[in-house]
């Protein structure tokens, strides 16, 4: 069995403090042959306490992981990737990101719903939770129509983790037709789907 992980966040992401060296050593101890670091980059993510979030310092990131890759080349294959937030309002930046092709892998994900973050409780106050989830899936289809620079679409049901308790019991069948169109669109674009 080939063990690998291609969705890893580290201290380069606003939501992690993990040291990449620890990740590499753990992967080696587990017998992994390949890993791919995919720290977050979300253009125009909402500020948190006045701080810019999920804005990757690309050059520093590439330099760090190229050095790490070289240091461990005889023990494990390290790939450099990114989890890129997809959104119509930043499609030009998404589509031109990594124009020098320094990345091995890009996960495209919809973390924001037309610029709003479902992580925050205020997101859920504007309409019913079920309608908010519907809007999320509609935004994914919109994002897929304009953002093309990714290899695999990440965590399609991302929003489910943030649905407020006792508001709506998530069931993907409620959005079956729309999810079918989303999956068909991803496949027609020749992209993979993260499971």
Segments the model singles out, each with a brief description of its role:
Residues 12-14, 103, 107-195:
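Domain-core and long-helix interface of multi-subunit machines
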Residues 1-91, 97-98, 160-176, 181:
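An N-terminally biased module of ancient metal coordination in phosphate/nucleic-acid-related enzymes
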């Amino acid at each position: 069995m080939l063990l690998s992980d291609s969705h890893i966040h580290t201290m380069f992401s606003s939501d992690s403090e993990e040291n990449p060296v620890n990740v590499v050593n753990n992967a080696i101890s587990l017998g992994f042959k390949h890993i791919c670091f995919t720290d977050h980059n979300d253009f125009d993510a909402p500020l948190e306490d006045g701080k810019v979030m999920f804005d990757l310092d690309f050059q520093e990131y590439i330099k760090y992981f190229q050095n790490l890759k070289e240091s461990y080349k005889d023990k494990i294959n390290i790939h450099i990737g990114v989890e890129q937030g997809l959104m119509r309002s930043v499609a030009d930046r998404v589509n031109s990101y990594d124009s020098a092709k320094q990345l091995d892998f890009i996960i495209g994900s919809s973390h924001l719903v037309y610029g709003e973050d479902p992580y925050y409780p205020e997101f859920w106050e504007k309409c019913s939770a079920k309608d908010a989830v519907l809007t999320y899936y509609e935004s994914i289809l919109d994002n897929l129509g304009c953002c093309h620079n990714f290899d695999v679409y990440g965590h399609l049901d991302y929003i489910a983790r943030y649905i407020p308790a006792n508001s709506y019991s998530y069931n993907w069948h409620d959005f079956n037709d729309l999810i079918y169109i989303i999956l068909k669109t991803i496949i027609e674009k020749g992209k993979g789907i993260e499971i």
